[in-house]
Amino acid sequence: MKLGLLCALLSLLAGHGWADTRAIGAEECRPNSQPWQAGLFHLTRLFCGATLISDRWLLTAAHCRKPYLWVRLGEHHLWKWEGPEQLFRVTDFFPHPGFNKDLSANDHNDDIMLIRLPRQARLSPAVQPLNLSQTCVSPGMQCLISGWGAVSSPKALFPVTLQCANISILENKLCHWAYPGHISDSMLCAGLWEGGRGSCQGDSGGPLVCNGTLAGVVSGGAEPCSRPRRPAVYTSVCHYLDWIQEIMEN
């Protein structure tokens, strides 16, 4: 298992158009301080993040879908078995119907997906769901991102421990300026406008946490990551609350 995880770090999937995003300018999270953080593995390869939103459901990006996935909860150090880890093989995926499955189209509209676990997660201090944000975030709000994505770009160096970074919600006009013609009302940009901090390859699908709730899902961004005036793009969760509730209830 440890050898497989080592291989995973060396063979993380590349992005399509917009790069799968990574955490630049991040520091190691305090172990299990983000108990909702999940890692998505295809075979032995860690390639996306996700967020536990109940004991049976995860929220992630639709472009993270694979024929089947392994989910790991309670994870911090990828090479060590530390006790609270839980492993699930998942096959029940619910991508938003508006998502364009042709990843070469560079269309990140409705880039959001629910994953149903085959059994209930065992909740503990290291495994806890995160509440969804019931309101849309405002520019200037301070938020937190986390993931095992690369900590350097364009030459990608991947961490073995979960990384965290504080970033800011940016004004919509800056998001449109950075990516003209690609930004819809259900997206938001976050990071530092001057660059140097934000998500990157391997962080896709992971959480943007604002005021202790899930406000965004990491969707995409520019390559190299965290360049000045090229912030990461997130799917704004507040626009999908009704859809999420409908899928989870039915």
Curated annotation (Swiss-Prot):
Domain of life of the organism encoding this protein: Eukaryota
Glycosylation sites: 131, 166, 211
Signal peptide: 1-15
GO terms, biological process: protein maturation; proteolysis
Enzyme Commission numbers on file: 3.4.21.-
Main location: secreted
Gene Ontology molecular function terms on file: serine-type endopeptidase activity
InterPro entries, alphabetized: Peptidase_S1_PA, Peptidase_S1_PA_chymotrypsin, Peptidase_S1A, Trypsin_dom, TRYPSIN_HIS, TRYPSIN_SER
Short name of any one Pfam family annotated for the protein: Trypsin
S-S bonds: 29-164, 48-64, 136-238, 143-210, 175-189, 200-225
PROSITE patterns assigned: TRYPSIN_DOM, TRYPSIN_HIS, TRYPSIN_SER
Stretches assigned to the Peptidase S1 domain: 23-249
Alphabetical keyword list: Disulfide bond, Glycoprotein, Hydrolase, Protease, Secreted, Serine protease, Signal
CDD domains associated with the record: Tryp_SPc
Record: active site: 63 (charge relay system), 111 (charge relay system), 204 (charge relay system)
Gene Ontology cellular component list: extracellular space; secretory granule
Compartments where located: Secreted
Tissue: Skin, thymus, trachea, cerebellum and spinal cord.
Recorded family membership: Belongs to the peptidase S1 family. Kallikrein subfamily.
Protein name, as recorded: Kallikrein-9
